[in-house]
Amino acid sequence: RALMPRFEHQRDHLEATIVDLEKWVAGGFGVPDFLDSLVLFRPDLHRVDGLENLVVFAMYTQNGNLDRNFEAVITRTVWPNWVADLEANKYDNPAFVPIEFVDFTAGYDTNSAVLFPETVATRELAKFHWGGIFCDREAARFRSITGAASELLKLAMPAELELMLADQRLTQETFVLWDLVHDRAHSHGDLPFDPFMIKQRMPFWMYALEELRCDLTAYRETVELEQNGVYLARFVRLAVLFD
């Protein structure tokens, strides 16, 4: 309630969250049900660069966590003009919401870089309208692991990769472009299967094929993007290879 004035565009959602919380408390903290508030959380309808959202749900976090946690996350939408133009004119994907962390509770102090509605505790499956990808965490993770791997292997890195490892902002924007093209590829082309029919992303080997297909699609697309003057395209190819 105290934070609501800061998130006026979320008022309906946050008011519903309070109701869901009060029901959960009244039921002795049994099985949580945040369906009513989840359906009102629509960051896909407010893709404005720099816009912050407050997310408070009982959820499973990613990376195989079997516990249902009560988490709070404040996100900031990453939607600069160049992303908006590419999404509108070439890679239409109304569910794509690139975000970065403003603050988070302990359950998100992990390597998880996604915020997906299917992880929220609900009495029934909600219709999905959005998927949040934390480009800042993707970039930081890439820089940390690639830097450590190159040092361990004594790998001479391309100059442009060294730029990425030294520049969080550059790498973050690179991942936004990669994610935009990759995510669009999930619903287009020759699918080995529909990945969103299987919420557990299983069997793992089959889902890995789908991820690889989308990454190779993104790699191929960057050739045309670079020819059309998209500066970040060359960095996406490096990110795909070294990731």
What is each stretch, according to the model?
Residues 1-3:
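Noncatalytic N-terminal accessory/assembly modules of large enzymes
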Residues 9-162:
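Contiguous, non-catalytic segments that form substrate-binding/exosite surfaces or channel walls
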Residues 161-178:
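Short pre-active-site segment immediately N-terminal to the catalytic Zn-binding motif
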Residues 172, 219, 223-243:
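Long, well-structured alpha-helical subdomains associated
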Residues 175-191:
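Active-site recognition of the HExxH zinc-binding catalytic motif
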Residues 186, 190-194, 220-227:
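Conserved helix-loop functional segments at active or binding sites
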Residues 190-212:
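Post-HEXXH active-site segment of zinc metalloproteases
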Residues 207-223:
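An active-site-proximal "capping" alpha-helix that borders the catalytic cofactor pocket
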